[in-house]
Amino acid sequence: MADNKINLDNLNMSEEELFSRISNDELSSEKITAPRYSYWQSVFRVFFRNKINVVMLSLLAIIIIFSFIYPAVIGYDAMVDPFINVMDSTAKHLKPAAAMEKFGANIHWILGAGASGESTFDAIWYGSSISISLALICAVINMTIGVVLGAVWGFSKKFDIFMTEVYNVVANVPYILLISVIVLIMTPNFWSMVFALTITGWIGVAYFIRTQVIIIRDREYNLASRCLGTPIGRIATKNILPFMTSVIVTLAATEIPSYISYEVFLSYIGMGLSDMSLGKLIEAAKSAMQTPGWEIEFWSPVAVASIITVVLYVVGQNLGDASDPRTHMS
């Protein structure tokens, strides 16, 4: 084996040229040369590493554009447009080809005409904006109340006794039945539906958060922090909250699609919104089942509602997985 050692005499350099003295700077020695860690940068790096997430986000962007921007661009008026052809009996329940022949070949009639002679395509996207807005508002309210009360529930033993009894009572009341009764008592509009979906919707979130807080609260490092006199607030923000982020995101991923499903189901059985929504469109399309070509009018809003719920669920679940600090090791 060849000798890999370097002979300094052969370099023809003085000792001063070969070596230089480094000053003992205490401040410099304290500096961390490693790149600064950013939690959310790491989250999105892990999230976008999965190509499926990119596809799902693209679909979500298209859904948002057509649900919220498209109706505003075309000037869709929910009080006028759905009834513009209501007096024309020949404009109702038309297939796409018949609708384009009657009204002109454009994007508005690619899914035909509905029960009132309205554009099914335009109505679906306006209805999507109503359903998505309802789901987002309900999710924000229930998640906010549920996370706050769940955290207190998990920390306070006195509050735990009271809330456990409340949970045992509320959890035994059928959720759909409670929503239906509230909607029947109140005027069936957007905000009454929000009230019905949030009056007890937070209790399940709070119970789940309470369970997670108890699990993390009793870990060894948290017990050691409490023994050392660390304030509860600091333990909650530094030791518990970072581990709860992925749990909260994952829980929200199931909450938002579930409220869209509730709205569609309640509207389909005639107990939902009075405003146009995906459920209302599906309920109105039932009357077209005896007419030729009813499949497009009925299954179009069903397909859009299904795509929206699946996309929101997949994006939320994968974002929740990416939020888990254990996935940031690599």
Cite the ranges covered by each PLM segment.
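Transmembrane alpha-helix boundary and packing residues in multipass membrane permease domains
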Residues: 63, 151, 180-184, 193, ...
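Generic hydrophobic transmembrane alpha-helix motif, especially the helices
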Residues: 110, 141, 146, 151-215, ...
